[in-house]
Structure formats: structure tokens, C-alpha cells
């Protein structure tokens, strides 16, 4: 018959962001354990609250699957004595396997015969195997761990109780001094300890004690109550899914309620109000049907409706205090000019090994100026870029950002507009921080995009020059994210940004203002920074599901513009299914490999047709001449088509021509032919890294 197993790990309150990943980990480890133990089951179902991590396993088999395996013993030569009797070695082997010499058979392995026996291992009862779930529970890993008592065991929070049931029987084991049983704990204030009669009665038992253990059901209940409240008041309650997930993991029995704040606080920018409610208080904010912010908020209580008015009043009081601070800072900040704030930045350190924020802005101004010109920004955009890059960090020393650090850039844009800065300048101040995550929103304006690239480039250059380089998972200055940001912006804008261009920008800034680099002189060995950025390029491109060998090929050429690497990968992926792809790549790869053996030819070197010794040399030269002129201006897909058109000529050429001829002039002429073709293939990286079968 099928069985149901339940394991509940009762804990002190777990941080909300840890709950879901932890119970998912428990599911994965339970699944792995059952499979390794050869126990059939239907499903592993997770339940979780801030005080418990639970799995329920349905459809469990009665016992492990039986297995029959072969055990290898000594060689036949050792197993039999000179008279053909079983030796002590053979007898000891079968005794250890629980069989007799009558069960022996021989099998050859690498030319030698060995003793083998078949060994039947009956499956253990599931009740006996499930005691091993102790190790599963103890093996969970968490972002932060703690110890308690006098032991060395580490866990997310102290374990307070354990429930382990196979149907209606307790599965006995012990973690530290906590023994498994059937007694669970209800809601901290509304419930009490209660016995779970059987594994399949877990949810309904907890519901009697005001605990909704199914996180999905709990979240749906929160959403329903929010929807009912919105309908009742004709509101639009903005439900951020991440916030809903967090709130769901803060409560065991949710009750949604609404509160309000004074309308006078609506004069404070919406971004500040929303941050105060959403990020600081975990409230959902409310708008009217036209999207205008209303002086109301919605929150979730971990409990029922008893004395709810006191809860509402308490939350209103806390929010009012925060909004009063925000209103004060907003009004106070406007008493000073942008120039005042910029002046203060001269005394604020960006990093003690790098310099002040003001010095960083001066470097970024030079980098942005160079990049803006190279990328073809208009005169107006260049003017706005120059202004934005000299003030874009000013809001860091405002009172508002001091209190709400997550509003940096956002308040800069708001204050810049209030002080009459051009729209492009104001927008760029906010967009400079984009993207704020590996998949975050990108700058839309050209000014903001260049400013963002310049700032990130300066940070990477400065920290690498100061030898503060990310290693392993350690990246305290988010340099990986900043490199990803540069690449993603370049790809989004379609700009020809490459590593050589970025190095050129740094060298330009250094030449213009060497004093700004007194602590972070541009490093002469750029291979480490190049590898760092190329790794991020590969990471971005991998999101497009390109083949690994195609990725390796296109990122192998470090000087290629990022957008070209993307286009090359797209074209190679498209043509990888062509019938002749293998032959084309093999022909071109043969060219590139031999071209590497060529001496250094000058840029003005020309192929000497008088040194040709067979028709294939002339045919290939003629074919190359036809395509070379238009190749540079062709689109990437057309370039691959052009290279493919040379396949037959290249194949015939190699069939008829000995490249490494005895005559030095002839040999070099042939190598020059190959070098010129190989140079065209470099638009696709290193084709010899492609795997073709």
C-alpha cells in the first residue's frame, strides 16, 4: 500500500527572504535521498511559514526496491589451488558475501578470469529507511548560519520542535536534544501546541490553530483580501510580486488592512513615498484609477481581525514619522544649489585608495566626452553629457539620499529638474545607475547611456588599478555587475564599443588630467581586465542559448566590438544547420591554422601572381579579389555568405598546392594568400574553436 510521510522542522522565526529557498532546498534533498534509497514515491510537497519548513511525501512504497548485484572476488588463479579445490581466499570471499562456493561463477576482465557471485539484497522497510531524513534535515545550508547552546551545529535559527510521521506513526530520530514526535506548534499568539494525528492531516490540524502552512494558499488568501479591499474602496492597490512573496513569508495567518496618511505628504515626490511604504514598511501603495497616488496604504497582519484598529493606528504612526522626515529633507534639500552639493563632494571619499567622488566625476567627465564623440552623439547631447557628468553624483550629499540611500540618482533627477537643468541632463543623472541588476532596466537616452558606461568604466579601471579585483564570489564593489552593464548598454544601443575603445578612452583621460590618476594609474598589463570583461560578455551572450563552441569562437577575439560578437554568434548559430556548414568551417579553419605559421607581413604586402605554379592559386586569388572590396561594408550574414563562397576554391587550392614549398618566395606568397583570407574570418572570432561533425 502507498504511504504518506511528513517532516516538519519547527524553528524560531526565519528571515522572510530565506523561507522559500530553504523549503525548496528541503524538497530537493528529500527527493535525492528517496531516489538514492530506492524508495518509489509520487510527489514531494513543500509547506512553509516563518516558523516551519515542511515536506510531505505521498505515494511512498512499503520498502526499498530489492536489488541483485554481482560481487567480484579474487582471480581464478588465486581462487583455485593446484588440485582444483577452492582456496581459503575464495572461501573467505563467499563467506563475506553471505553465499557459498556453489554460487561462484567466473567472468573475464581484461584478459583475466575472476570469481564472481550474485548477491541478492532485499529492500529495507520504508519506516527504517526514513530515519535517515535526520541527515537531510541537518544538511540544509543557509545564507547566514548561527549556533545556539553549547554545540557546534549551525542552522538558520534554533530548532524548537520536530514532527516526523509515516502515516500515523512517529519516525524516531533526534537532532541535538530535540526528538521527533507528532506535536506541532500553532500560531504564536492565536494557537497552541497540537498533535498531528497522521501525515495527511497536517494542514487541517494546523488550520485549527490559526496557521495556514501551505504558502500558495496563504498567498492566494492575501491576494483575495487585497482584491476585496480594492473593490470595496474603488482603489488600485499596486501589488509588487517580490513584496507579496516577502510579506507571505512573514505571516502564518494573514489579515489584510488599510491605513492612511495626511494628504500634505503627497507634495513629497511619489518615489519617496513609495520607497517609504514599500521598501521600509513593506506596505502596498494605493492609486486611483488614473494612477495618481492616494494617501492610503495596505499591509498584512500576522493574526486575525481582533483589535485591528490598534494595529492600523500603530502602522500609521510609524509611517507618519518616516514621511515627516522625508518632507523635512525634501524641503531642506531645496535650500541649497547643485553647485553647493558638488562642492561638498570634494571632501567625500569614493574610496580611500582611489580618491574623492568629485575626482571620480572629473575622470568620468573626460571619459564621457571621449566616448560621446566616438559614438556620434549630437552637439546638444554632447553639451548635456558634459554638464551631467560634472554634477551627476551631487544628490549623494543631500539629506534625502542620506536617509533613503536607495533613492540615489532618482532624487538627483528630481532636484535637477527643480533647479532648471535640461531634461537630458536630469534624466541622465537617474539613468547613470542603470542597470541596477544583471537583468535590470537599461538607460534609454544616449546621454544617460554614455554617462553610465563612463562611470562603470572608471570604477572598473580604478579598482583594478588599486588591486581590488573580484575573486570567487567576493565582489564588494559590484564590478561584475558594472561590466555586465557596459556590455548590455552597448548591445542595446547597437554601439561599436570594444575593449580597445575603452582602453583608448582611459588613455585619453589620463593624458588630459594625469593628476586625477595619482592613485589609480592605468595599468599597463590589461590582460586581466580584458579577461574580466570578456567573461562578462560570454555571460551576456550565453543568455541567448548559443552553443558553447560558438560562444568560445566569438569571444576569442578580444578586440571585437561587443555588438559584432553578438551578431557573429547569431550568424554562426543560424548557419550551423546548413548542409555545407561543416565543409565551410573545415576549409576556413585550415586556412586560419596555416596562416598562423606565416611571417609578419606589412600592411602593404601584395600577392605576386607571377609566383603562382598552378591554376588553383590564380582561381583563389581571383575569387578573393572579387569579394574583398565589398566585404568590409557587408552585413554579418552577408560576410558569412561571402566566406562560404570561397569554400570550393579553398578546397581545390589545398588539394593542388603544397603551402610550405621549398622556394621561400613561393611559400611566403602562398602564406600571404591565406593570411588575407584569414583576416576576413576574424570578424567571426576564432573559427577553429567551432566543433563540427
From Swiss-Prot:
Pfam families on file: DALR_1 (PF05746), tRNA_synt_2f (PF02092)
Biological processes, Gene Ontology terms: arginyl-tRNA aminoacylation; glycyl-tRNA aminoacylation
Enzyme class: ligase
Record EC number: 6.1.1.14
UniProt keyword Secreted present: no
Keyword field: Aminoacyl-tRNA synthetase, ATP-binding, Cytoplasm, Ligase, Nucleotide-binding, Protein biosynthesis
Chief site of localization: cytoplasm
GO molecular function: arginine-tRNA ligase activity; ATP binding; glycine-tRNA ligase activity
Gene Ontology CC: cytosol
Chemical reaction(s) catalysed: tRNA(Gly) + glycine + ATP = glycyl-tRNA(Gly) + AMP + diphosphate
Domain of life, per lineage: Bacteria
PROSITE patterns with a match to the protein in the record: AA_TRNA_LIGASE_II_GLYAB
InterPro entries per the UniProt record, alphabetical: DALR_anticod-bd, Gly-tRNA-synth_bsu, Gly-tRNA-synth_heterodimer
HAMAP family for the chain: Gly_tRNA_synth_beta
NCBIfam families documented for this protein: glyS
Similarity comment: Belongs to the class-II aminoacyl-tRNA synthetase family.
Name assigned to this protein: Glycine--tRNA ligase beta subunit
Name of encoding gene: glyS
